[in-house]
Amino acid sequence: MPTINQLVRKPRKTPARINRVPALNKNPLKRGICSKVYTTTPKKPNSALRKVARVRLSGGAEVIAYIPGEGHNLQEHSVVCIRGGRVKDLPGVRYHIVRGVFDTEGVKGRKKGRSKYGAKKS
């Protein structure tokens, strides 16, 4: 344990916060264009075909983003909106596509949690 004198000479340094979404560049959302839409499999012990897209952002960065909800209409050259938020069982996927914005349609027939999936009240 340091003495008061040592702390006066050299104060404690707080560790720098790591940025988990560097491509967003301190923005809450960013626009991008899909360069590839595909499915990938999660880490053990999970098993599925998760829908993801490689997206070139307006800042020039290329990221992999998850497409949430059941069914989607995305294809190459679709314009999408990206937010932060990783998918725990997909390594390298640190962004989510926002449903119901730009070319992304909302989830059809969604009754609960509609605001998260861009679904209109039916």
From Swiss-Prot:
Protein name from the UniProt record: Small ribosomal subunit protein uS12
Presence of keyword Nucleus: no
Positions of modified residues (3-methylthioaspartic acid): 89
Stated family: Belongs to the universal ribosomal protein uS12 family.
GO (cellular component) term, any one: small ribosomal subunit
SS bonds (residue pairs): none
Oligomer status and interactors: Part of the 30S ribosomal subunit. Contacts proteins S8 and S17. May interact with IF1 in the 30S initiation complex.
Signal among keywords: no
